[in-house]
Amino acid sequence: MPSSPLRVAVVCSSNQNRSMEAHNILSKRGFSVRSFGTGTHVKLPGPAPDKPNVYDFKTTYDQMYNDLLRKDKELYTQNGILHMLDRNKRIKPRPERFQNCKDLFDLILTCEERVYDQVVEDLNSREQETCQPVHVVNVDIQDNHEEATLGAFLICELCQCIQHTEDMENEIDELLQEFEEKSGRAFLHTVCFY
């Protein structure tokens, strides 16, 4: 088992549902975890598919919660958005954008291919300083509450297995292959350097 704990980041588009569900479960299991979004804005479902609620990443979960409570308490209670924001504000004050974080991680898990591409592109555009490797793995998770929960448990199980490897660099590919077979999902994987 590695001497230092695995530093994990979970990234989705708006740092609301998928990454926060995984953040919640991983932190309860004792992982050193942070979560992020890669979007230019935070988007939450609105009264119609073409009318999302759009916020700046500086907006707190509490402010979003109160805004939606004021707009339509019944709608946002019924569709689970208020419940989700309530959970989020217990974890951290506001969503964070991956591109603004300069912390180093051992493992970055993304929740969809577009986000994976954005994370890899961002890491590759940074100036390499330490040459420390970071594994970026994509686990496709649909953006709804049920799939976010299932995906979070899968991510947690994957992190626990990686945490217990003797040699992450040499064992991760085999581990991901086992997870693909077990879960029926395909994982994208690449290594970037800090």
Curated annotation (Swiss-Prot):
The keyword Nucleus applies. The keyword Hydrolase applies. Disulfide bonds: none annotated. It holds the Pfam family Ssu72. It is found in: Nucleus; Cytoplasm. Its EC number is 3.1.3.16. GO terms for cellular component: cytosol; mRNA cleavage and polyadenylation specificity factor complex; nucleoplasm. InterPro entries: RNA_pol_II_suA. GO terms for biological process: co-transcriptional mRNA 3'-end processing, cleavage and polyadenylation pathway; termination of RNA polymerase II transcription. Keywords: Coiled coil, Cytoplasm, Hydrolase, mRNA processing, Nucleus, Protein phosphatase. One of its GO terms (molecular function) is RNA polymerase II CTD heptapeptide repeat phosphatase activity. It catalyses: O-phospho-L-seryl-[protein] + H2O = L-seryl-[protein] + phosphate; O-phospho-L-threonyl-[protein] + H2O = L-threonyl-[protein] + phosphate. Gene3D superfamilies: 3.40.50.2300. Signal peptide: none annotated. Residues 160-187 form a coiled coil. Belongs to the SSU72 phosphatase family. Interacts with GTF2B (via C-terminus); this interaction is inhibited by SYMPK. Interacts with RB1. Interacts with CD226. Interacts with SYMPK. Protein phosphatase that catalyzes the dephosphorylation of the C-terminal domain of RNA polymerase II. Plays a role in RNA processing and termination. Plays a role in pre-mRNA polyadenylation via its interaction with SYMPK. This is RNA polymerase II subunit A C-terminal domain phosphatase SSU72. The gene is Ssu72.
